[in-house]
Amino acid sequence: MTIAEQIRTIAADARQAAIAMAKLPTTAKNDLLMAMAMALISNTPHLIDENRKDLEAGEKKGLSSAMLDRLMLDEARIKAMADGLREVAGLPDPVGEVTRMWKRPNNLMVGKMRIPLGVIGIIYEARPNVTADAAALCLKAGNSVILRGGSEAIHSNLAIARILGEEMERAGIPKAALSVIPFPEREGVLEMLKQEEFIDLIIPRGGESLIRFVVEHSKIPVIKHYKGVCHVFVDASADFDMAERIVVNAKVQRPGVCNALETLLIHKDVAEAFIPRIAATLTDLKVELRGDDCVRQFAPQAKKATEEDWQAEYLELILAVRVVDGLNEAIDHINAYGSLHTEAIVTRDYHNSQRFIREVNSSTVLVNASTRFADGNQLGLGAEIGISTTKLHSFGPMGLEDLTTTKFIVYGDGQVRQ
């Protein structure tokens, strides 16, 4: 069979398997995930051997040290994958939950019940752990999942999927509910994105270029997250100690993640007092500052910011800083340059905090807290499949519930429409 024919078969089989997955009781899904976790641990030497093939190929290709690090599996990372499966097993099962129930004047009882989405396609880059993480979340939510990882991790991904699939067979669960596209060629991705007859949703996880490629070529709905241009606004009433703590944490703790701070906005009334303080602290922490003229007046070490800086996702120790006239300009700036990801205000003014929450058009908005909390675990969702900056079907960090949809359920007693 051609690649196109094989991928169509994988997708069709996943659709059939999704029917069985939707019927699985919670205990069966949890038992499966626990067995999968044990299987990963017991197959650690095999996984490391398969991963070594990817690492050796990556070194020959000249992959960067950072890419090779993301690609690498060792005992600790395999244990972390297994722990992740156990964590998902411990999460509440959203499938079958009745989220609302109301009574109509004709005594009909109407409700909404959570059901699986069906078949979910995950397209991701060279992170073998995503194979286990994404599979666990999709399966727990009663879905089939089709995985297409980066070609750099092909041996690792296939090995992980094979081990997990063996546990599904032992449990009497259709193995087709978990598939990996085995073709490293880009044609495999393109054919996967054509299977709108069988796949309900595509979730790409990776850099902006990957996500734009998927969106451009997909016939299937896509959950998008292009980049994280996250802001903190220090209001005129802000507590400076709190503001400094939040800014440092948001920028410095992990600068290479999507919920790290990229642009700092400061109210003009506190610019003279706060900018020298925060600039000195950040400079000591090796952060390069890029500011407007007002910022550079109080922090001469800052480079002159350009228009591109206001829309940049640096993912490194660089911070754009701007002085604004007040809350209105801060909100306008965020809504103009932000990426609908995560924004925070530091303020003691309740009215300003509520306006910021209502008017900032992003998926996570915080008051007096670091942008680093925009994460499924930190927000109490448990493990997350990703962060969506698409308002349909989900907005913000996506947990198990976001891998389901709802249907109407109606209880009657013989009513007919008049």
From Swiss-Prot:
UniProt key word Glycosyltransferase: no
Family classification: Belongs to the gamma-glutamyl phosphate reductase family.
BP-aspect Gene Ontology terms: L-proline biosynthetic process
Protein task: Catalyzes the NADPH-dependent reduction of L-glutamate 5-phosphate into L-glutamate 5-semialdehyde and phosphate. The product spontaneously undergoes cyclization to form 1-pyrroline-5-carboxylate.
E.C. no: 1.2.1.41
Domain of life: Bacteria
Protein name: Gamma-glutamyl phosphate reductase
InterPro entries in UniProt: Ald_DH/histidinol_DH, Ald_DH_C, Ald_DH_N, Aldehyde_DH_dom, G-glutamylP_reductase_CS, Glu-5-SA_DH, GPR_dom
A Gene Ontology molecular function term of the record: glutamate-5-semialdehyde dehydrogenase activity
Keywords per UniProt: Amino-acid biosynthesis, Cytoplasm, NADP, Oxidoreductase, Proline biosynthesis
GO CC annotation: cytoplasm
Protein's pathway: Amino-acid biosynthesis; L-proline biosynthesis; L-glutamate 5-semialdehyde from L-glutamate: step 2/2
Any Pfam family matching the protein: Aldedh
Organism (species): Geobacter metallireducens (strain ATCC 53774 / DSM 7210 / GS-15)
Top-tier EC class: oxidoreductase
Localization, UniProt: Cytoplasm
Reaction equations catalysed: L-glutamate 5-semialdehyde + phosphate + NADP(+) = L-glutamyl 5-phosphate + NADPH + H(+)
HAMAP family cross-referenced by the UniProt entry: ProA
Gene: proA
